[in-house]
Amino acid sequence: MVLGRFYFKQTANGNLLGEFSNTGMGLNKTESADIISRFNIPFIGTYRSTWFQQTAQSLNLEIQFKIDSNDRIYSLTWTNNNNVAFLAEGFIVDDILIGDYRDEELQRFIENQF
C-alpha cells in the first residue's frame, strides 16, 4: 500500500511541474505532466504524467473537480490502460495544487473500513 503527498505548479502552457514523496521513499522526487486535453480551466484536464522512482514511470492523469464539492477540491486519477494506479485529492494554495495520494490497494482498504 502506498500513501503519499504531492504538489503541482502549472506553467503558462498548461503543463504541470511538481514533486512528490510517499511511504516507500525517504526523499522528494520530481514529476511533470504534459497536458493533452484543451487547457481552459486551471489544472482541470487530461495529462501524460512522468516521474522516476526506481525506474521511469508514465501514466495518464485526469484532474477534475471532486463530485459534490464546491469546485475548490480536486480529484486526481492516474491510470494505465484504464486501470487505476493512484487516486488523490487536493486543493489550491497560492496557485499550487497540493494534496495526498494513495494506490488502488490502499483506496480499497479505506473504503472497506467505512
Can you name each region flagged by the protein language model?
Residues 1-114:
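Central antiparallel beta-sheet cores of small beta-barrel/beta-sandwich binding domains
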